Amino acid sequence: MKLTTLQTLKKGFTLIELMIVIAIIAILATIAIPSYQNYTKKAAVSELLQASAPYKADVELCVYSTNETTSCTGGKNGIAADIKTAKGYVASVITQSGGITVKGNGTLANMEYILQAKGNAAAGVTWTTTCKGTDASLFPANFCGSVTK
């Protein structure tokens, strides 16, 4: 009779059960952490792409008003001044001769996003996209090297 009462008082987890749970958590963490880090870098790349948007519109207006790309430089012909001070993931945005170069900062320090305008007022403007850096795969698929209107 006393034996059954002792067995009912034993509650909790054994050391083996706790070690198995810890091992499972460790395995899941080794899979999840690299995926999360890659995801955050991809989100940061979108900041590089967004930084070029206002300059892209300015360069197009410049091309339509001057009929060439060579005079489309930051701070001239209606184009916003270049950004030379780092802010967030963007180190700088430089516009020169119709080209827009966005350099990354922080975890994206080795990355560059380059847009080059070609065309004139009659033909319109086309953009060639170039992505540089060791993590260029973080840019959207079929994005780098594309030509868009």
Curated annotation (Swiss-Prot):
The modification N-methylphenylalanine is found at residue 13. PROSITE patterns: PROKAR_NTER_METHYL. The chain crosses the membrane at residues 10-30. One of its GO terms (biological process) is type IV pilus-dependent motility. It is found in: Fimbrium; Membrane. Keywords: Fimbrium, Membrane, Methylation, Transmembrane, Transmembrane helix. Residues 1-12 form a propeptide. This is Prepilin peptidase-dependent protein D homolog. It comes from Haemophilus influenzae (strain ATCC 51907 / DSM 11121 / KW20 / Rd). The lineage of its organism: Bacteria, Pseudomonadati, Pseudomonadota, Gammaproteobacteria, Pasteurellales.
